[in-house]
Amino acid sequence: MAATLTTVRIPTFHNLRRSRTHQRSLNEHFISLLTFAKMEGSEITEQVGEDSRAKKKIFVAGATGSTGKRIVEQLLAKGFAVKAGVRDVDKARTTLSSADPSLQIVKADVTEGSDKLAQAIGDDSEAVVCATGFRPGWDLLAPWKVDNFGTVNLVEACRKRNVNRFILISSILVNGAAMGQLLNPAYIFLNVFGLTLVAKLQAENYIRKSGINYTIIRPGGLRNDPPTGNVVMEPEDTLYEGSISRDQVAEVAVEALAYPEASYKVVEIVSRPDAPKRSYHDLFGSIRQR
């Protein structure tokens, strides 16, 4: 916004004494100037806020995954700069919007230790989003390498870079045993490949004790199709069924960066067609810190 200079004629003290009309005129003009200043100030504040957000760089681990890719896209759409941490840089260039100047693609493997991850995160990242996940197979240690030790490595890398905001994409039912859900088919299936949910829960516990400002997001069953309902958000160890679009999971992760109400919380999310639409301020605000 171009600033406009307005010349204001201020009555002299002598004239003020001679005329009460001048006094009233001056008061009215002064009030007008104050109103103008407030309007200008609010717009400037908005612009500065938007510019500041545009400069924030978010590191996304697992950026080429089905959920991670959506997180990257939504962060860019919101005006954030993104550093996409990927294992295969060449693949990422074809998968992600590599032509976007706000996107930087870097090699980052969470299984290779915190030192290399710290180098990838760098000094310019203000927050880290962990959207990693192992590929099901016969390596029963894979969930622990990625979902447990890999997440721990990321947290330690954040410490080394003084990054104090961490968003983790986890899963409902990670604490299924304590919830009495040992016989839940979803709990059994998700633990078939190396006790995946147990590995995720151990990583969650590490994050909580680390002192970092965290938001742990536990989505229900992940769908690739567009959203068909509104987000339902509940406290930890509440939901044991339900599904949600990956687009909505990505949205929750991005919004968690914007709302202080999301700090130091574990939230569980699904979507339901009959659920009322609520703001993220209300959704995060409805969950108590543990």
PLM regions and their residue ranges:
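N-terminal chloroplast transit peptides
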Residues: 1-39
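Active-site-lining helix/loop region of Rossmann-like oxidoreductase modules
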Residues: 38-46, 50-53, 63, 198, ...
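NAD(P)H-binding glycine-rich loop region in Rossmannoid oxidoreductase-like domains
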Residues: 44, 52, 58, 64, ...
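Aromatic pocket-lining residues of Rossmann-like dinucleotide-binding sites
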Residues: 75
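Short beta-strand "acidic-cap" motif of Rossmann-like dinucleotide-binding folds
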Residues: 82-84, 217
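Alpha-helix termination/capping residues and helix-transition junctions
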Residues: 122, 160, 209, 259-263
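Glycine-/Pro-rich loop/turn segments that contact NAD(P) or position catalytic residues
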Residues: 134-241
